[in-house]
Regions:
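Polybasic, lysine-rich low-complexity intrinsically disordered segments
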Residues: 3-6, 17
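General helical secondary-structure elements
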Residues: 5, 25-26
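Active-site-proximal alpha-helix that buttresses catalytic centers in soluble enzyme cores
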Residues: 28-337
Length: 337
């Protein structure tokens, strides 16, 4: 975080007191709010329902007219999905609590230990400890200069934008106006790529295949990042070309990470694949899906599969359960080893 911040993006979501370089105001007490997506408090139906209600009613997540969003979420999703998801959380729950919360806190503690005279707090966009709670703790600690750090390497409306906008709203509500800076996206920053590569390398064998599985997004979210309206889904290999039109595109950022990692590992194109997981609802989402990709790889003779999820900086339901249990079983059932 400390290294990536030095090349970070300056505040795009608020015009208040923007600092251009971290540490410029060295005489002021500094703080970092590490923001992750969030998790239920407990692995039971009611806690999952409470979490999903807050998450799915966010217009940055399901961006349809408010009446339709409430009808969909309250009238359909919340009546059925919590019962299906609660057992999945139970299968990965730790003694200390939710894996995502536990690992995000450990990351926050490690960042604080490696940054001199800096207070670090966790802020979950949905659930606890909330972004507001983290900001209030920083304020009470006497912090005058704060870095808002969304833990999402790839920019998206539903993650980075939602977290930052909500953080500024909460800062206003608690009447706190510190000097601020944002940690922007960092899909191919060496300080992200290098340790990611080293975490993958020990698992690769001569005959193994590497699958990059990213959290999926609705196509409508991806298209909205193309301010020109002339590039996304209209140009061949639109995500593989770096232009101003896709500079804030989630799918393009995922491609940048995949390219950087595969290149540093010395992999040829036949040695790796890229897919998207965790689809929700009937809307068109980014393709190919991780489930279909894994099935096809196994059917085409791939026996040893390594899956990496660069979109998640802390393990949670999508990695520990969806990939390590569900997708693993899918691969084995299709003949994989």
């Amino acid at each position: 975080i400390k290294k990536i911040t030095n090349n970070g993006r300056i505040n795009h979501y608020s015009k208040q007191n923007i600092t251009t370089t971290w540490g410029y105001f060295d005489h002021m007490k500094r703080g970092v709010l590490l923001m992750n997506i969030g998790t239920p408090d407990e692995p039971n139906v009611e806690s999952v329902r409470t979490y999903l209600r807050e998450f799915l009613l966010d217009p940055d997540v399901i961006d349809i007219p408010t009446p339709l969003r409430h009808l969909l979420v309250r009238g359909i999703i919340l009546k059925t999905r919590p019962k299906k998801i609660a057992p999945r959380y139970q299968s990965i729950w730790m003694e200390e609590g939710s894996p995502l919360r536990v690992f995000t806190q450990k990351m926050t503690d490690a960042v604080e230990q490696n940054m001199d005279d800096t207070v670090c707090e966790v802020g979950m966009r949905y659930g606890n400890p909330s972004i507001r709670y983290g900001l209030e703790r920083l304020k009470k600690s006497g912090v005058k200069e704060v870095l808002l750090a969304p833990l999402f390497p790839h920019h998206a409306q539903a993650t980075t934008e939602s977290s930052l906008k909500f953080a500024y709203k909460q800062m206003k509500e608690i009447n706190w106006n510190p000097l601020t800076k944002e940690l922007g996206h960092f899909p191919n920053n060496p300080n992200f790529i290098d340790p990611l590569v080293e975490s993958i390398r020990p698992y690769l064998q001569e005959d193994s295949h590497l699958l990059f599985s990213y959290h999926g997004l609705p196509i409508s979210h991806v298209k909205r990042s193309d301010k020109s309206g002339k590039h996304c889904q209209k140009v061949e290999n639109c995500c593989g070309i770096s232009l101003d039109a896709n500079s804030m595109c989630y799918a393009h950022h995922c491609s940048l990470t995949t390219e950087a990692v595969s290149k540093k590992l010395g992999l040829s194109k036949v040695d790796w694949s890229m897919s998207y997981q965790s689809r929700l609802g009937p809307a068109k989402w980014l393709k190919p899906s991780t489930t279909e990709t894994v099935q096809n790889l196994a059917r085409n003779g791939i026996k040893k599969l390594v899956i990496v999820s660069p979109a998640f900086l802390a393990d949670g339901l999508e990695t520990l359960e969806e990939l390590d249990i569900e997708i693993r079983e899918e691969f084995l059932s299709e003949g994989g080893e």
